[in-house]
Amino acid sequence: MQPPATETAWPPARTAWFAAIVLMLANTLAFVDRQALALLVQPIKQDLGASDTAMSLLYGLSFTMFYVLVGLPVARLADRSNRRNIIAFSIFLWSIATAACGLARSFGTLFAARVAVGAGEGGLSPSAYSMLSDYFPRNKLAAAMGVYQMGIYLGGAMALVLGGLIAGSIPPTSTIDLPLLGATKGWQCLFLLLGIPGILLSLLLLAVREPARRVLGGDHEVAPLSAFFRHLGGRKAAYFGIGLGFALMILVGNGTGAWIPAFFERRFGWSTAEIGAKYGLIVFFCGTSGALIGGFVASWLQGRGIARGNLWAAVVGFTVLIPITIAFPLMPTPELALALIGAMNFFAGFNFGGGLATLQELTPNRMRALVSAGYMLLINLVGATLGPTAVALVTDYWFRDPAALHYAISFTCAIASPLSLVCLLIGMAGVRRAQRQAEL
């Protein structure tokens, strides 16, 4: 575990929290753009003639494809250059790509636009995690990470609520004649509108200061890759245990999140507007409160001197998620399903602050963006790609019935949720060994 650097004072609290809030807004926008697709599965399928499996690839693989190719090199750049500027450019890029989704006239062009969204978003979180670790001391870092991760749920909720409201005014299956663009479907209009806020946010980000790096031993140069892999190899149980644990948790989150709107449509006959309003509010209140409370609980445990307090908070959340994720798709009424989905969002958000803070504490400053990119790569390959696709494959090829979607969701969660806890416990044991080695 890396001891705190002492060369410079920490930034003023007001400056640090302003940066955390602006970065949270960037994360919010990223998830608005990402989650909006889940609300539009049915109209896009109808217009483009896509299957559930094809839509799952559009939701997961298209985003991950360029994240894999772009995320790691951009993170390497972030470890040696201005992270704020990287984030500002990334926001601008994915916002243009989101608007391009509204211009798509075929599945192939929509897939290509989603690839560009992934390329842009690949520059956000690794740089943001690294910046936050230079803004906040160890006893406050988990809380700051929790605030940043609130963006996941704010973004998901905004996509659902605003998407539902827009769908009430401009039905996704309707056709509108727009100047220059001609006949445009309602779902395409939503993507065009979503591209606008990011351009403004990329300008706001310029008001955030790039924090001084808190390096150890006067080493201000980026670490060579050989040193990076040597550091990683000496702590592989910690890094891969935590990474796989969160990847499997996100597999459950993305696998359910991508299909929950379709779940309510198919099982309970809800409209797009009804889903957006009700499910969106659940995500907003439960997810954001979980991320905020979980981050502060982890910081409180860490501040009390409890060994691996950050991760103990996550262990509680992972454990509670197991029965909830398996049970919610099987509820006989939409109200019971929504109640359990609310609990699922709360405890999923509860876990992030402590887990992310642990990864930053475990890593030297000039390796943090690259480690964060590796973490994001893992959770996107396993979670973002496999989650929606796993549910779709079980629906299409195991049950062979779109109406059995709720069974497919429950089956997927019954495998992934317990495995996520096992991996996290392995990671915690690895952190304990790394701490003991650092004390020798």
Report each predicted region and the residues it spans.
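Helix-breaking motifs and short loop linkers at transmembrane-helix boundaries and internal kinks
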Residues: 49, 82, 103-109, 120, ...
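Central cavity-lining transmembrane alpha-helices of secondary-active solute carriers
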Residues: 60-75, 281-294
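Cytoplasmic helix-loop-helix junction between adjacent transmembrane helices
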Residues: 113-152
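Extracytoplasmic gate region of multi-pass secondary transporters
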Residues: 37-38, 237-291, 349-352, 356, ...
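Juxtamembrane intracellular "pre-TM" segments in multi-pass secondary transporters
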Residues: 5-12, 211-242, 267
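Extracellular/periplasmic helix-loop-helix junction of adjacent transmembrane segments
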Residues: 40-69
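Helix-loop-helix hairpin linking two adjacent transmembrane segments in secondary transporters
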Residues: 148, 152-206
